């Protein structure tokens, strides 16, 4: 279907000049205009993309955001600082413990509260597990969307072991809600058991699973053809657009907030 504007469209100024700007971008011969999302399993109802396709290659994408507004700010007005942690978990259910830590860290900074060294260590370990949890799904879901189902299953299998750790410390697998202002929900049930679970995952399971996922994807000709050289971001572009984390480092930006400006 061709891409058309409506009077309710908020991202374009509906003047003649703006419509002229779109000429040549719609109904182009040999190009396919695809309306992707928001009601699509891969978008999770968070955004809509109007894609211009040349075969499998996306030539242009016009994003439309704003579908995820859930009134979080208004909800926060009726909760205290510790109750709100439950909502932060839902903001990013892929790695909820990271949002728990970020929320209470912000409150503690405003209130000038210092954490004990033990609390900082526990939060740091859980934060890193949360990042691994996030990246496993990121790579796995990308593989799934590009036709490499097995890589997705490998990633999800390893995430289950992080869920086991979260369940052990908090009693909740999916949304641990473990942090509190100035500390944690409670101390580790058993430090020795916690250490064994973490070491088993990081030193035994994860190195093998990462190697397996890497082999599955890097030797998958279809997957490689669909990603190699596509959508590359230069170091200069990454810096100009303020990319952070793995995206920035993959583009050659030697920047890691945990080392450059530690917050725990």
Give residue ranges: language-model regions.
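Active-site bordering "gate/hinge" segments
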Residues: 1-48, 52-264
